[in-house]
Amino acid sequence: MTFVHSDKMLGDNIISADVWECDEMQESCLCLTHRSGLKILISQKKKSTVCGVFAVKYGSIDTNIAGEGDVPLATPYGVAHFLEHQMFTREDGGDWQEDFSALGAEVNAYTSYDRTAYTFSCTHGYEDALKLLLRMVTTPTFDKRSVKKEKGIIIEELRMNADSPWERAYSELLKMMYSTHPVREDICGNEKSIKKITPEILYTCHKRFYAPSNMVLSVCGDVDVDSIVKLCDECIPVEIAVDATPGRCFESDEKMKKHYTEVKVPSKKPTFCIGIKDGESTPRGKQLLKKDAVLSVLSEMLFSRTAPLYNSLLEEGLISPDFSMGTSMGDGFCFISVMGEADEPQKVYERFKEYINSVAEMGPSEKDFLRNRRILYADFVTAFDTTEDIANTMMNYAIDGLSPFDFIDTVKEMTFDDVKIAFESMMKEENYALSVAIPTAQKEGQ
């Protein structure tokens, strides 16, 4: 694919233009740097749908901002998520979603531990939808009335999550594994922290983090590069170019003080969540990419539905088919989690430990490593199938200063020794924890 990427043709506000390419995948995307500091990623695809993602490197773990004299100012837990919800409120009190619907476009948003993203998709008139998205995210409106209303909505959401055995088992696990890191707190915050949020706090955090230099715009579909650049010129003032990257500096989290916790929930069956904490410092850039790939392969080798542990537990009736596992990592945190339903969670936990010990004695399987590395590679390639997947993939890598195609080289260069080292480092009983959500009636009857 050929992109027009002459700085002169793209306008005076584009200070650099690069084409990221992957010959193996026959994929490429254009990466532009706007004078405001905004990174603009464009993948031109002859597809019926256009998808755009406007993201900010600001998530639930970013609870400290620089105050007067650069003294850290603590903000309540849940502000990033609260702010995301409030961005949909227009100045007249209406909802921006109505404007997108009028264009025939869909709009959505989400907040994670370390980023917030706003997305749109449409089959026609992408310029109008993109302009609307840029306006919505860069022109906030926070007032006491809308903030008060939002507090009620989010507090109700928190109460609903408190009744979910899966949500509670997972959240209690994080509180047990991390004593100080903000990842231990729910992305939505808690009732006490939500009540502390004010319009002033929201404006302060928006001004601090929602600056173009801390944001990425990713667009995929049958689009024109020049039209996207012109919209950015129109909606993103260059005079607000500042360095707004979160100054994330988390203290080294101490070792876990306890390895078991349980909580009562209104459910029919116990839900367990096993955590495996990585106590080493979390790298950044391409080293973080490598660690992510290695742990993804390792967790698939050990805990996927094709692995011995899942099948033996299921055949013996110790777990139900509802089962999930995954890895999560970011600045200052890294862990693997395994979740499911079981009448006897403690027995499942013992079997888990026995299983890891047997793998340690025999050594991980190189055959399993090669198979799961191929699967990881194939899954990444498949992610370039739809405009939504492509736009989100480009954003997720670019916001960490990476090209999406860096992952291909990372997977190819990963060795069996990398996985064995990770296994030996993480798979120790001191790193394990078990959180159980027990049905209320069951615990009361014990």
Language model feature labels by segment:
Residues L30-S36, D253-E254, T261-V265:
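Short acidic-hydrophobic surface loop/beta-edge motif
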Residues Y77-H85, T89:
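Active-site recognition of the HExxH zinc-binding catalytic motif
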Residues S48-S60:
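Short, surface-exposed, low-complexity cationic segments
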Residues G59-Y77:
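Short pre-active-site segment immediately N-terminal to the catalytic Zn-binding motif
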